[in-house]
Regions:
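A composition/biophysics-driven feature that prefers long, compositionally simple stretches
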Residues: 1-249
């Protein structure tokens, strides 16, 4: 039988006769790519046993043919964001203090991008930099990313942040003990969730950054209005071209 899996906000299993019929099935999976909520939603009612792979076979193949150009991260100016990253960090620290929590492990890269006012070119047509961030209530910050993507200029801007190569994330998290650590089940993988849970108390909460970044400041609002004008002009030009050239050979 063919198995088709759609992963995302509306994750679902489209064809599953093989999994439904018969005895317990063992499925190998990469625990760094799935969160607990998604697996429960997809397979919760099926007789399955998931076996985490030590190494993702696709990653091994990809490394053999990995000759891509390293594209640097870059920062956005305050004239664009309306707020520097230190003020944003203080808001997250306040969230931790008010709930008497020690740490938050931010695993949604788009939220790391917003918090630190940084962007990247890791994925085509997306400015999101692949990264994680660990922030504690005492103002210690650890950015996990490909360190080759951080140039001297950006490193200077983020001088208050410890930048650690993303391949060291596992070893670093193992050292954290006896803390109350916030994770978002929608974005934190099973691998990291289990790793943190070994020596700490897991607090499952929605990443507070989703709410924080939804509240726009005056500069963001004004920039959105200005961009809307450029966007409207571009659409108008396209519609004009389409009407003028519809049916022609162009």
């Amino acid at each position: 039988s063919k198995l088709r899996l759609v992963v995302g906000k509306n994750s679902k299993l489209l064809h599953k006769p093989y999994l439904i019929n018969g005895n317990e099935k063992k499925i190998a999976f990469d625990s760094k790519l799935f969160n607990e909520l998604t697996l429960t939603k997809l397979f919760g009612k099926l007789n399955l046993k998931f076996i985490p792979m030590k190494k993702n076979l696709l990653d091994i193949l990809r490394k053999r043919n990995n000759h891509k150009i390293v594209r640097k991260f870059y920062s956005l100016e305050k004239s664009v964001t309306g707020e520097d990253y230190k003020k944003k960090i203080n808001k997250v620290k306040k969230f931790l203090r008010n709930r008497k929590l020690d740490l938050i492990f931010i695993t949604a890269p788009e939220n790391v991008a917003w918090l630190l006012n940084i962007r990247g070119e890791d994925t085509a047509y997306s400015p999101i930099p692949n990264s994680y961030l660990l922030l504690d209530v005492k103002n210690n910050l650890f950015l996990f990313c490909d360190t080759k993507k951080i140039d001297k200029k950006l490193s200077k801007k983020l001088k208050d942040i410890n930048i650690i190569d993303i391949i060291q994330t596992e070893e670093f998290l193992k050292k954290i003990k006896n803390k109350k650590v916030v994770i978002d089940q929608l974005t934190c993988s099973i691998f990291f969730q289990n790793l943190i849970k070994k020596n700490n108390i897991i607090i499952e909460k929605k990443d507070p950054i989703y709410l924080l970044k939804s509240i726009k400041n005056k500069i963001e609002i004004n920039n959105t209005k200005e961009i809307h004008l450029y966007d409207g002009a571009a659409i108008t030009k396209f519609i004009f071209w389409l009407k003028k050239n519809y049916g022609s050979s162009k």
